[in-house]
Curated annotation (Swiss-Prot):
The gene is HFB2-1. One of its GO terms (cellular component) is extracellular region. Induction: Expression is up-regulated in the presence of root and stem powder of Shanxin poplar and under nitrogen starvation, but not under carbon starvation conditions. Aerial growth, conidiation, and dispersal of filamentous fungi in the environment rely upon a capability of their secreting small amphipathic proteins called hydrophobins (HPBs) with low sequence identity. Class I can self-assemble into an outermost layer of rodlet bundles on aerial cell surfaces, conferring cellular hydrophobicity that supports fungal growth, development and dispersal; whereas Class II form highly ordered films at water-air interfaces through intermolecular interactions but contribute nothing to the rodlet structure. It comes from Trichoderma asperellum (strain ATCC 204424 / CBS 433.97 / NBRC 101777). It holds the Pfam family Hydrophobin_2. This is Class II hydrophobin 1. Its main location: secreted. Homodimer. Homodimers further self-assemble to form highly ordered films at water-air interfaces through intermolecular interactions. The keyword Secreted applies. Residues 1-15 form the signal peptide. The lineage of its organism: Eukaryota, Fungi, Dikarya, Ascomycota, Pezizomycotina. Belongs to the cerato-ulmin hydrophobin family. Disulfide bonds join 19-69, 29-59, 30-42, 70-81.
Amino acid sequence: MKFFIATIFATGALAISVCPTGLYSNPQCCGANILGVAALDCHTPRAPILPGALFEAVCSDEGGKEPLCCTIPVAGQDLLCVAPVGTA
């Protein structure tokens, strides 16, 4: 029984997203982030992004871009972006 409960908690910990739910829920790889207000040259990462260190690696491999969690992306630009959980 203890193993079962520990497994449930471990599974839940693995499912935590690097981007918060709600407003900043869109993971993006961006070329420039201007004071967290505007991000330029953004696109959705080509690979799944769990955990945060993997998100950094994926964006870095895609042209040295910065991983960000943003509001709704429009035409390669995002407004209001924050750093993802688990990144430097």
